[in-house]
Amino acid sequence: RQVAEVADVVELGVPFSDPMADGVTIQEASRAALADGVTLDWILDLVAGLDLGTPVVLMSYLNPLLTRSHGELASQAKAAGVDGFIVPDLPYEESGPMRQALVPSDLALVQLVTPLTPPARRRRLAGASSGFLYAVRRTGTDGRERARRHRRRRRRRTRGLRRRAA
């Protein structure tokens, strides 16, 4: 219950073997989670055992969700205590079947907008989004800039070590 005091919503990521929109950190976390046997079913079981007092949404690429029908996904997610989904690689124009399957279970399908989303499309996505609208801070992969800074720092340290060794 303490989570509800500091968070409006909890986002849990479903690992995927090819997280193309994610940066190095999340890619490595996905690989490690998959290697440890984390699956959509594992995450649903985890959520079912939690009592956070705040909504839980699953961030997932579409492929892991397609291991079952949209209707099965909705009923299993609702039974586990999930409140919605963020599916970054599911374009709004193709989201109708999933959205329709989630509505009877009162599950949200959160849409994403970026700084480059045209205003008319942003309004359309805001109207179609349920739960909340996910505003991506910048375009590109998550964690890219942080990873770049980390590599630069590592190179500087390595150069310093090479100079001392010479």
Feature map (PLM): residue ranges:
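Active-site cofactor/substrate anionic-group-binding motifs, chiefly glycine-
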Residues: A4-F16, A29-L40
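Glycine-enriched alpha-helix->loop->beta-strand junction motifs that scaffold or abut catalytic
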Residues: V6-A7, A77-G84, V103-V110, G127-Y134, ...
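Active-site-adjacent beta->alpha loops and helix N-cap segments on the catalytic face
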Residues: S17-I26, A35-A48, L65-E72, V87-P104, ...
